[in-house]
């Protein structure tokens, strides 16, 4: 974008992002006029192997956007032979206060040539190519599963479902077609709450998750960020269970038999499902305590049970935890869901961000397992 607003004119280089003196709110922008601003491409959800990248026609570059007066942007393109291709890019943001929780607002523009109402192989070239974005406390990386497919180490959801690290923002379809078949701008925005890592780093990630089985191409430009420090928030036991219920959308329903949960409660359906699934059993006296703060031990047990209560290798690990939570705590530490420090003080409340992040990791691991099983037995 060459017609910059006052905010967009505050184009800050990485050195500005590395500043440690924060006001109430900071801002940064990337317009890609001179270079790619340090963004790195990443492609996942396709098999590894010699010549595969060429077969999938994966392309990434700092190129001129084919819109009058647009200047340059980031070009991404790929052929979705796997019916599940994610293609995107990310950038490290440095200089934040280690361990501090931040609230971000991000806007960007995407140039797409896909007109509305189109149909295609496997899905629509517009409505079935989902745009996602997020800010994570871990560097986006691709890892290979047991079948050799590249997967993202972050929770991005799958196609039309968002994740805890990358949320669903929309799709590639033009909102209004002015020039049929030509590239036109589409605006996106999202909010994110993310904690900086031990070195004061965060990662911005943007991309598309495709259900259209052919070539998709687009340009990213004018990425604007604003952020401010924010306080941790405690998550309650009822809200934690409802978070899982809302994300999973289970078909089965049941009636909870907790004496302190009425049918009018916003947690009624979620607790019925959680009790039937044996994810949450209450305090053992018929009381659940939906408004009580969720503790680290309780969070670990819920996630451990959802993961199927896998066998735990103690390997001489000694953790001071409640008997009912010991295996879950060891499992949580071993899988990077909770820190050893938090595990040693499992009776304290867990904050909302830490629980959401841990849940995202567990859900992503389960999703990758399901994808691998489907590839084996479609």
Predicted regions mapped to residue ranges:
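Sec-dependent signal peptide cleavage junction
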Residues: 17-25
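Extracellular carbohydrate-recognition regions
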Residues: 24-54
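Short carbohydrate-recognition loop motifs
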Residues: 65-83
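Short beta-strands within extracellular/lumenal beta-sheet-rich domains
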Residues: 80-97, 185-191, 220
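Short, surface-exposed tryptophan/glycine-enriched loops
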Residues: 146-201
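Short beta-strand-plus-loop segments that form exposed binding edges in beta-rich domains
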Residues: 172-176, 205-214
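Extracellular carbohydrate recognition
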Residues: 180-187, 195-197, 210-227, 348-349
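Feature responds to low-complexity, polar/acidic, surface-exposed segments characteristic
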Residues: 228-270, 276-328, 334-353, 361-378
């Amino acid at each position: 974008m060459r017609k910059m607003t006052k905010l967009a004119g505050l184009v800050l280089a990485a050195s500005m992002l590395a500043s440690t003196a924060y006001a109430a709110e900071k801002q940064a922008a990337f317009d890609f006029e001179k270079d790619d601003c340090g963004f790195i491409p990443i492609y996942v959800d396709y098999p590894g192997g010699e010549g595969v990248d060429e077969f999938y026609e994966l392309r990434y570059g700092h190129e001129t956007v084919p819109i009058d007066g647009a200047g340059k942007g980031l070009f991404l393109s790929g052929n979705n032979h796997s019916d599940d291709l994610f293609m995107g890019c990310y950038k490290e943001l440095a200089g934040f206060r280690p361990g501090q929780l931040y609230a971000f607002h991000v806007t960007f523009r995407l140039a797409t040539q896909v007109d509305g109402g189109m149909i295609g192989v496997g899905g629509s070239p517009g409505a079935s190519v989902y745009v996602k974005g997020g800010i994570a406390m871990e560097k986006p990386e691709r890892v290979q599963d047991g079948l050799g497919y590249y997967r993202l180490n972050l929770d991005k959801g799958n196609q039309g479902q968002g994740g805890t690290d990358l949320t669903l923002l929309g799709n590639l379809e033009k909102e209004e077609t002015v020039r049929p078949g030509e590239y036109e701008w589409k605006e996106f925005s999202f909010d994110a709450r993310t904690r900086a890592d031990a070195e004061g780093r965060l990662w911005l990630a943007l991309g598309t998750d495709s259900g259209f089985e052919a070539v998709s191409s687009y340009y990213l430009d004018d990425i604007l960020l604003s952020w401010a420090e924010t306080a941790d928030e405690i998550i309650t036991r009822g809200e934690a269970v409802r978070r899982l219920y809302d994300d999973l959308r289970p078909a089965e329903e049941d009636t909870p038999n907790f004496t302190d949960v009425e049918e009018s409660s916003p947690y009624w359906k979620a607790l019925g499902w959680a009790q039937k699934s044996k994810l949450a059993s209450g305090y053992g006296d018929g009381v659940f305590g939906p408004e009580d703060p969720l503790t680290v031990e309780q969070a670990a047990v819920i996630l451990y049970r959802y993961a199927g209560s896998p066998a735990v290798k103690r390997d001489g690990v000694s953790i001071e935890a409640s008997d009912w939570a010991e295996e879950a705590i060891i499992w949580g530490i071993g899988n990077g869901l909770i820190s050893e420090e938090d595990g040693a003080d499992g009776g304290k409340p867990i904050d909302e961000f830490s629980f959401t992040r841990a849940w995202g990791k567990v859900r992503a691991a389960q999703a990758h397992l399901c994808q691998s099983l489907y590839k084996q037995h479609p």
